[in-house]
Structures are given as structure tokens and as C-alpha cells.
Amino acid sequence: MNAVMTDVRDLIRYCDDVLDAARFADYAPNGLQVEGERPLQRLVSGVTASAALIEAAIAEHADAILVHHGWFWKNENPCLIGIKGQRARTLLSAGVSLIAYHLPLDAHPELGNNATLGRRLDFIDMEPTALANGLLWVGRLAQPMTPASFTEHVSQRLARPALRVGRETGSIERVAWCTGGCQGYIEQAASLGVDAFLSGELSEQTTHQARELGLCYLAAGHHATERYGVQALGKHLAERFGLWHRFVEIDNPA
């Protein structure tokens, strides 16, 4: 396919509209974080705007990088020094744009991290709830599983071992989930009457909460649970604008 040249700002306006980005009070700016020096024909997507992803994008002759975890987070030192300075120098010297969408990409009902993870894990009857600003989703397994078999299913589908705490017996059918670092929503998930709650990370207190709530909790990886939304958005943009697109996986066990 011959890629079509696109003004990056046209693409940003489209993304802002599709993802309803203005609705979210986020922890970092959504949209165009660093403006490159040329029109967009080749797009690389990835989870996090790390040095490894930037270098991989440059090797692919990308004009822009699309990520879920970008730069300029609130309460973070804004100065471009140390590794942040090195990342910025590498990106700017290559003339590559950086595009990031955080909460809007978590929440989108088709392209978002929660929606795409649910499909990846073969959940059915999926829908967002009113809890956690709509970021907490609920659904069912097509067939009930034991906690052990559910853990194995998730591990296989995500190609990463999931860590289980809390409930060890009984049947898992109704599931709540929220990608990334959302273990703090465990009590809200339990209030939905689900058998299991899945997110990316595990905190010290999560183990005790899961046990006391009688809930099966799976920590399936922050990175692993947030790989699929940015892939879906990148693919959608490639089809919409006639771009060349490739998702680059930078392994992260966290």
C-alpha cells in the first residue's frame, strides 16, 4: 500500500473527536505532545514512549509515534533532563511527532483498552459501568471456570503469567476489569457482585482486600493489559487516513 501524506494536526483533530478527549481531566496532555517536522505517512504505535520505542520507530522511518503512556505527567519534573532529555533529543533530531492518548484510550467503547482487552479474553456481555468514571467494565465468561483455570486462560491469552490472590475455590463467571494500575478499584468492583476482578498491578493491600471481599483478583500486567487499545487505534487511523502502520512491542514484565 502506498501511504497517503496526512497533516498530523488533521489526525489529532480526528482522534480528539473520536475519543472525546476533551471530556477527560487527565494526568498528562492528550493529543500532539511533540510536533515533528514533516507530514505523516508512516505511523508506529506502542504502549509507552520509551527510548527503545523511539529508536524502533526511527528504524521504521516513522513520521509519528502513537502511544498510551506519553510524556509531561502531572507532578513530574517538567524539565527535559536526564533520560527524558535524551529521549526528547532523539525524537526531535529525527523530526518525529509524538502523539499520546491516556484516559480517552482507556475508555473508548470500541477502540479502548478495556474494550479490546475484554475481546482478547473472550468475555461476553461486556459493558462499562458508571463506576470509576466509566473505566470499570463488567462482563461474563462464556463458560464458568475455576480460579485456577481462569488464571491460566488469562495468562495464555496475554502471553504473560497472571498473578492471582484472594479467592481460590468456587466458580468464576461474572468478571470486572480495568486495565493498567487500577487495583485501587477492587472494592468498587466487588460492589458489582462479580466473582473476579482483573487489572494490571498488585499492591500490598490488594491481597488482603481480595481475601476479605471473597474476590478472585488477577494482576495481569500493566503493560500487558494496555497493549491492545493503541494497536486498535493505530490500525483504525491507518485505514481512515491511508497510512502505513506498525505496532512495536517493547517487552515489559510490569
From Swiss-Prot:
The keyword Metal-binding applies. Belongs to the GTP cyclohydrolase I type 2/NIF3 family. The lineage of its organism: Bacteria, Pseudomonadati, Pseudomonadota, Gammaproteobacteria, Chromatiales. PANTHER family: GTP CYCLOHYDROLASE 1 TYPE 2 HOMOLOG, NGG1 INTERACTING FACTOR 3. Coiled coil: none annotated. The keyword Ubl conjugation does not apply. It comes from Allochromatium vinosum (strain ATCC 17899 / DSM 180 / NBRC 103801 / NCIMB 10441 / D) (Chromatium vinosum). InterPro entries: DUF34/NIF3, DUF34/NIF3_sf. Keywords: Metal-binding. Homohexamer. This is GTP cyclohydrolase 1 type 2 homolog. One of its GO terms (molecular function) is metal ion binding. GO terms for cellular component: cytoplasm.
